[in-house]
Amino acid sequence: MGRDIIADIITSIRNADMDRKRAVRIASTNITENIVKILLREGFIENVRKHKETKKDFLVLTLRHRRNRKRSYRNFLNLKRISRPGLRIYSNYQRIPRILGGMGIVIISTSRGIMTDREARLERIGGEVLCYIW
């Protein structure tokens, strides 16, 4: 039985954000690197470093936290895994869901690589809906 790498990184980021950790370490694969590039480009994380330990590559993500008047920190990231190994969810470009009226993003795996919902609509291409981020 294989591991769900995308669910692992989503869970790691969500847990680190709820625990107010500044950095989180995830395994480095092509899929995780592409998803992290999207998170960095969209401003959900501050920084990414590649780290190598005994033949294994890791990505160290620096999370972004927002300060609030009442509490010192507010959970900033909300991530939800949509398509999973037991139930794949596919969508054409016209039916890609909009999260919070376009405020959030949908990460989609297409034949041209992993991209956001906006990029997929511009290129008029559909694919597997991996996760929602808002």
Curated annotation (Swiss-Prot):
Annotated organism of origin: Daucus carota
Keyword annotations: Chloroplast, Plastid, Ribonucleoprotein, Ribosomal protein, RNA-binding, rRNA-binding
GO CC annotations on file: chloroplast; ribonucleoprotein complex; ribosome
Annotated HAMAP family: Ribosomal_uS8_B
Protein name: Small ribosomal subunit protein uS8c
Purpose of the protein: One of the primary rRNA binding proteins, it binds directly to 16S rRNA central domain where it helps coordinate assembly of the platform of the 30S subunit.
Family in the record: Belongs to the universal ribosomal protein uS8 family.
Gene Ontology MF, one: rRNA binding
A Pfam short name: Ribosomal_S8
Compartment(s) of residence: Plastid, Chloroplast
Quaternary structure and partners: Part of the 30S ribosomal subunit.
GO biological process entries: translation
Gene3D superfamilies hit by this protein: 3.30.1370.30, 3.30.1490.10
